């Protein structure tokens, strides 16, 4: 269900604005998107896992808040990120 340390490092390296950047909205959204994708796959086999579903909903809302923040700060970075991640908005 969770992502490995190597995968997380790869995501951070891909979306970071500078070396060691783990706190930028782009990196946080990318990591959350990976975790959301893993949990979505988990629910295909464990439909009644409501405890994890609550965590998924929290992650989705956190990602939404980060995306709204990024959109307010810099529209171009927001558009680039959602295209790169393949999000619907």
Curated annotation (Swiss-Prot):
Keyword match rRNA-binding: yes
Pfam families according to UniProt: Ribosomal_S15
GO annotation terms (biological process): translation
Cysteine-cysteine disulfides: none
Keywords: Ribonucleoprotein, Ribosomal protein, RNA-binding, rRNA-binding
Keyword Ribosomal protein: yes
Listed name of the protein: Small ribosomal subunit protein uS15
Species of provenance: Bartonella henselae (strain ATCC 49882 / DSM 28221 / CCUG 30454 / Houston 1)
């Amino acid at each position: 269900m969770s992502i490995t340390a190597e995968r997380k490092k790869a995501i951070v390296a891909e979306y970071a604005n500078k070396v060691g950047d783990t706190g930028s909205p782009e990196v946080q959204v990318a990591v959350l998107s990976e975790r959301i994708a893993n949990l979505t796959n988990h629910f295909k086999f464990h439909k009644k896992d409501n405890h994890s579903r609550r965590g998924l909903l929290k992650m989705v809302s956190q990602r939404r808040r980060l995306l709204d923040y990024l959109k307010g700060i810099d529209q171009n970075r927001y558009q680039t990120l959602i295209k790169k991640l393949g999000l619907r908005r």
